[in-house]
């Protein structure tokens, strides 16, 4: 797995150059490098046996060694905020969260999300929790929640959490 992860990271980082200002907002990932990916086992029909079961996210979360290796490779490869490669300033995060059926290990769904900016990891975590509740309560469809994250989670925050 380690060799495969390294190969995927190299392909993802070096076949697509990261142009300056590629993200519309520094809190959003580069859509070409991180388009998002879903877990095929999670569908609208299975939410009550998957994501809505307490402990689901923990049961599918990849190991810290996997995500840390990926984070360092991405930061070193240029996927960072204005040249800041300090790992502590980032959380390797799932663009489409596990809580709404995001793929646990797909490189296309993982990115070094900044912690030190206004639209950073803490705000996205609030949206993840809010949409998870709405999906499990049947007030938002799974597909809608996944789309919020893959298109523009900041706009989703403003709509579902507040200003």
Protein language model regions, located:
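Nuclease and nuclease-like effector domains acting on nucleic acids or nucleotide cofactors
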Residues: 2-91, 99-163
């Amino acid at each position: 797995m380690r060799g495969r992860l390294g190969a995927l990271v190299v392909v993802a980082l070096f076949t697509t150059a990261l142009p300056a200002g590629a993200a519309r907002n520094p809190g959003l990932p580069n859509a070409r490098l991180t388009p998002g990916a879903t877990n095929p086992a999670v569908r609208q029909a299975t939410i009550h046996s998957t994501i809505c079961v307490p402990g689901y996210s923990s049961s599918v979360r990849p190991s810290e060694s996997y995500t840390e290796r990926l984070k360092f490779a991405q930061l070193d490869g240029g996927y960072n905020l204005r040249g800041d490669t300090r790992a502590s300033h980032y959380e390797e995060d799932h663009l489409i969260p596990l809580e709404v059926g995001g793929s646990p290990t797909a490189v296309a769904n993982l990115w070094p999300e900044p912690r030190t900016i206004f639209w950073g990891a803490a705000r996205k975590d609030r949206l993840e929790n809010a949409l998870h509740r709405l999906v499990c309560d049947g007030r938002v469809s799974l597909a809608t929640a996944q789309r919020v994250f893959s298109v523009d989670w900041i706009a989703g925050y403003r709509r579902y959490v507040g200003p």
